[in-house]
Amino acid sequence: MPYSHNVELPPAVRSHLPEHAQDIYREAFNHAFAAHTADPRQEEAAHRIAWGAVKRRYVKEGDFWVERSS
């Protein structure tokens, strides 16, 4: 189920990630969801891919996700 807006993201994503990271998550999830239509674990795969996309740009420091240094 693709997400149109960040407010539709799972609570664990919304409550922990900054707005920009939520955008990355949503866009990566939607793209992966569309790309894995034949996969019976489509939604699970899309969530894994979305978290991977976030982790390429952000790192968790303590309780907060912060953008990686260039």
Model-inferred region functions:
Residues 1-70:
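C-terminal alpha-helical interaction appendages
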